[in-house]
Swiss-Prot record:
Record protein name field: Superoxide reductase
Transmembrane segments: none
Keywords, ordered alphabetically: Electron transport, Iron, Metal-binding, Oxidoreductase, Transport
InterPro entries, alphabetized: Desulfoferrodoxin_Fe-bd_dom, Desulfoferrodoxin_Fe-bd_dom_sf, Desulfoferrodoxin_SOR
Protein EC: 1.15.1.2
PANTHER family in the record: SUPEROXIDE REDUCTASE-RELATED
Organism: Pyrococcus abyssi (strain GE5 / Orsay)
Cofactor(s) needed for function: Fe cation
Taxonomic path: Archaea, Methanobacteriati, Methanobacteriota, Thermococci, Thermococcales
Subunit record text: Homotetramer.
Length: 115
């Protein structure tokens, strides 16, 4: 199962866990997802974050909705930084889920409650 391959942890001590930060003004939601906030992640052709995805699962929804995906196709300093900003509109509460993919260490996840 895919769920058995996705790793998680505390982003303050694990450089692969995506950090989710959001601001909500009315029904407009701005979400920033980054990898390596406390402990920088390498960005070389040999070891890098390939992509980040953000999902929103409304409290009354059956399935999460893919808000967006950002692929990082350039690797080496100073070309890319594993950080993405997403905007969407909702009046609903729910969960924000982020996935990131490290080419060596696989899939990583995090989640926060959207109020």
């Amino acid at each position: 199962m895919l769920k058995d391959t996705i790793k998680s942890g505390d982003w303050k001590g694990e450089k692969h866990v995506p950090v989710i930060e959001y601001e909500k003004e009315g029904d407009l939601v701005k979400v920033e997802v980054s990898v390596g906030k406390e402990i920088p992640h390498p960005n070389t052709p040999e070891h890098h974050i390939a992509w980040i995805e953000l999902y929103f699962h409304p409290e009354d929804g059956q399935f999460p909705i893919l808000v967006g995906r950002v692929a990082f196709t350039s690797h080496d300093d100073p070309l890319t930084e594993p950080r993405a900003v997403f905007f969407f509109k909702t009046k609903k509460k729910g969960k924000l889920y982020a996935l990131s993919y490290c080419n060596i260490h696989g899939l990583w996840e995090n989640e926060v409650q959207l109020e």
